């Protein structure tokens, strides 16, 4: 594909993914992400691994768009950086077709060694603002990476990964995939603190009901925690059992204050 054809495809995809885009002139003059990818396409054609200095188009792209794309990176057609700013794409990064990045995304390395050290993104991947994808890992086709996530492990196809470190929170079926939908499932971000609190509230509610029903022995001897808790979590055990504070089946009557006083008096005799 010629350079002009690549530029044309990169511009067309903007109208499919950004509802604010109105005219080609507007896209060409006001979209820094488009400026960055156009200059990258030129620099990539001129780049040679051992050539010094780097193509001037790379420097120009940084000054104009505040986007740093190494000319050695391999980027497929119809690539779009929305709100292009503070995006970094390393030398050995590989990006498939129809990929969308938002501002603040880093496709970085975790080692200074030569060779493959940056991530590979499959086709139709969407990466939210501020996300960091680090190391020679693979993000499968149609995957979604939530905003501000830090991903250091492979992500299967069709999955949504969110959080620090990134965790898979949703797997989409083929019929559920929306190539350009901004469905990052941020509401599924893991919340271990909230989960632990939910466990405790569930336990308190259960104990209160048993106490009100008069089941003091049963409440003290066996308690079931919030059903969604992780059995391996020491805070949220699904079957926590405590020994009863009395040996017989009947609760022991607390000593009256007067009895304790009289007991001390008897002991002093």
From Swiss-Prot:
GO terms for biological process: cysteine biosynthetic process from serine; nitrogen fixation. Residues 256-269 have a biased composition (Basic and acidic residues). It comes from the Bacteria. GO terms for molecular function: serine O-acetyltransferase activity. Pfam families: Hexapep. CDD domains: LbH_SAT. Its EC number is 2.3.1.30. It is an enzyme of class 2 (transferase). It catalyses: L-serine + acetyl-CoA = O-acetyl-L-serine + CoA. Residues 242-269 are annotated as: Disordered. Keywords: Acyltransferase, Amino-acid biosynthesis, Cysteine biosynthesis, Nitrogen fixation, Repeat, Transferase. Transmembrane segments: none annotated. GO terms for cellular component: cytoplasm. Belongs to the transferase hexapeptide repeat family. Probable serine acetyltransferase required for optimizing the expression of nitrogenase activity. May be required to boost rates of synthesis or intracellular concentrations of cysteine or methionine. This is Probable serine acetyltransferase.
